[in-house]
């Protein structure tokens, strides 16, 4: 009986763990459904992290351009070229401002993002390392989240709170595609727009695992 109970306990733990684990998928480059173009609000991020002070400002910055599947799985660390900073030398000044690491060297962050996500993105209009980062910059210019929110009177504030549905609707109205949003400690922290992998145009995001906010949230103006 003691052995049976132990086995049942192990099975229960395994079953519970399996039900909460995010699906990860290793695959070949280009084998995914769409991109998530992810931007993070600096002050929300730096509220829970020790950020480099001169990088803090009132802005969204690029977190990444991530291949994604409709079922919540995603490819990562695909075979392909290794990150080489020389390939993006002409983009560095803009990347330093638009796609910075807030906690460490920018090149370390770019290496991680390309190794994990960029290697799987080499498909269609994105053919190499330079294309990957240039596309991120282009999308950042095109999808100005702060402007979208301000067009619906949603401004950074340490006192005001906003309904997540109003944030989502503001972005949808401005750009024509339903986004995903994430919150941390009651603050808007991350916004993702979904991008067609062939045309690089915005599309409605499907229901994304882990992308939701509840209650009223802040859009902080300080960390």
From Swiss-Prot:
Glycans are attached at residue 144. It catalyses: a ribonucleotidyl-ribonucleotide-RNA + H2O = a 3'-end 3'-phospho-ribonucleotide-RNA + a 5'-end dephospho-ribonucleoside-RNA + H(+). Its EC number is 4.6.1.19. Disulfide bonds join 46-51, 78-120, 183-213, 194-205. Keywords: Disulfide bond, Endonuclease, Glycoprotein, Hydrolase, Lyase, Lysosome, Nuclease, Signal. One of its GO terms (biological process) is RNA catabolic process. It is found in: Lysosome. PROSITE patterns: RNASE_T2_1, RNASE_T2_2. Inhibited by Cu(2+) and Zn(2+). The keyword Nuclease applies. Optimum pH is 5.0. This is Ribonuclease DdI. It comes from Dictyostelium discoideum.
